[in-house]
């Protein structure tokens, strides 16, 4: 039954399975003044979905490095900035660039590029040419981060 569900989810396209955006099309974006000012999707991001993605240990995995405000999960990370007040510290444009490719902001960042498929290192064959999150998932997480005031 579980395999049937996974097959159905994959056939829908753009569904995240084990943290990978299966069948996610890449969209062009432009970096301007340290951010990506234009959303990756026409549909606005949904903050509730964004929080679900960020706190899911099989999808966003943000809590591996960050502490998430309001989360009761044990073993949240402390090697990256606490996400409280993210919407006050950064604009949606800046947050979008950090999600898409954090190394464009800080070349030494260990944060994965969630919406990048080229110039990556040590990517398993089954995960090549696929972003970690699809464009809508990135926009959802950005909407959630912006809401953290």
Where would I find each of the regions flagged by the language model?
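Protein kinase-like catalytic domain
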Residues: 66-69, 145-149
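Periplasmic OmpA-like peptidoglycan-binding domain that tethers envelope proteins to the cell wall
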Residues: 125-132
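Gly/Gly-Pro-rich "capping" loops immediately C-terminal to redox-active cysteine motifs
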Residues: 40, 44, 53, 63, ...
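Electrostatic cytochrome c docking/interface patches
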Residues: 24-57
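An acidic site on a long C-lobe helix of protein kinase domains
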Residues: 46, 91, 133-137
